[in-house]
Amino acid sequence: MTKPYPRAFSHIGLSVRDIDRSYKFYTEVLGFYTIMPPTEVEQDDSAIGIMCDRVFGPGWGRFKIAHLSTADKVGIELFEFPDNYPPENNLEYRKLGIFHFCIQDPDIEGLAEKIVAAGGKQRMPVSEYYPGEKPYRMVYCEDPDGNILELYSHSYELTYSPGAYQHQLDE
């Protein structure tokens, strides 16, 4: 058996209510690059139509999609399906599957303000992981559709590096 190796994270797909509003939010507020602006895909015999039949099953009809990219080349796909709807609880953390994704920015306070000004929501106060010891901060927010995004002030590796919780173990 071949030893496993770390794979790169390629992209995430987000279902949104209004693709034009979400496209503007993710490009203008979060600064993501446009790979493909909002485009309509219809069920037909094209390669993409057949591929979508395999993913969504028969009768999906049509949807709109946009492809974006982050600074570290992770793709963000925005999907607007007809008759889509928000979940009753957008933070179903006990439900299996993805319940949030995280964006890194050194000024999470400023970015959270921009998110709120653009129709999103700040779910909690900015919090410090190691008050008085390390400057690592985080906050949970929502995009205008209620998709949960976390903001980190520092990289995941720095925040959770070996010894990150050592001060708690020594007490």
Short names for language-model regions:
Residues M1-Y5, L14, P37, I76, ...:
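Vicinal oxygen chelate
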Residues T2-P6, L91-K95:
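Short, flexible turn/loop "capping" segments at secondary-structure junctions
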Residues R7-H11, F63, L96-H100, Y136:
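Short, solvent-exposed beta-strand edge segments and adjacent coil->beta transition regions
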Residues F9, K73-L78, I98, L149:
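Short, structured motif recognition centered on aromatic/hydrophobic residues
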Residues S15-K73, A117, H167:
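Core segments of cupin and vicinal oxygen chelate
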Residues E42, D83, S155-L158:
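A short acidic/small-residue loop/turn micro-motif
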Residues A47-M51, P86-P87, Y130-P131:
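A cross-kingdom feature marking solvent-exposed beta-strand/loop segments within repeated
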Residues F79-Y85:
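Short beta-strand-to-loop junctions in surface cap/lid or active-site-entrance loops
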